Amino acid sequence: MLPNGKPDPASLSDRQRRILEVIRDAVVLRGYPPSIREIGDAAGLQSTSSVAYQLKELEKKGFLRRDPNKPRAVDVRHLPETDNRTKAGPKAKARPTAGASPQPELASSTSFIPVVGKIAAGSPILAEQNIEEYYPLPADIVGDGELYMLQVVGESMRDAGILDGDWVVVRSQPVAEQGEFVAAMIEGEATVKEFHKDASGIWLLPHNDSFAPIPAENAEIMGKVVSVMRKL
């Protein structure tokens, strides 16, 4: 840190400068930071763990800030001025300058959501729990809490507008209210359904007449679906 309390650009390696440049470009062009994989491609880092390490170092140096009340939300701040002479990695590109503010002091909060495999919306399949990557989404859209993303497989939630191949953002919580869409674990397998409780018991309801309700007395609620995304 400099005497005025601001981060010291001299403490940055060439690669760290490139990472900050990539983040800045993405924020300027589309309003949110790049994914872990995009950062790695641009900075010449092959593994997501290497990118995560560099991001932690940048946080320690004061160039990134995480909000303790918003898990995985990152504020990008104090981005230093750089030129196009030093680029780490074969896929590096010149940063845009036209019409762009060159040094945003504080970007909107962004949640880096871990992608943890697929979730069944039909006949349940075993959910893959390995984190594949992190995907940046505006915190204003996905909200607070421990969040993760799962891909929907199957047609059982079709009539609710949740289609095969969609991505759902799930907020981890062990309980659900009547009518909420949830990710639930049943005998080691995961599925997304509507939570329903009545005199006959607890049920996970599909939104497709071709599928039957699932008795859920022994189901584990993994979380509430808070957002649905689709690639057109």
UniProtKB/Swiss-Prot annotation:
Keyword Methyltransferase: no
Catalytic-site annotation from UniProt: S156, K193
The keyword Lyase is assigned to this record: no
Disordered: region residues: 62-107
Family according to the record: Belongs to the peptidase S24 family.
Subunit-level organization: Homodimer.
Protein name: LexA repressor
Record lineage: Bacteria, Bacillati, Actinomycetota, Actinomycetes, Mycobacteriales
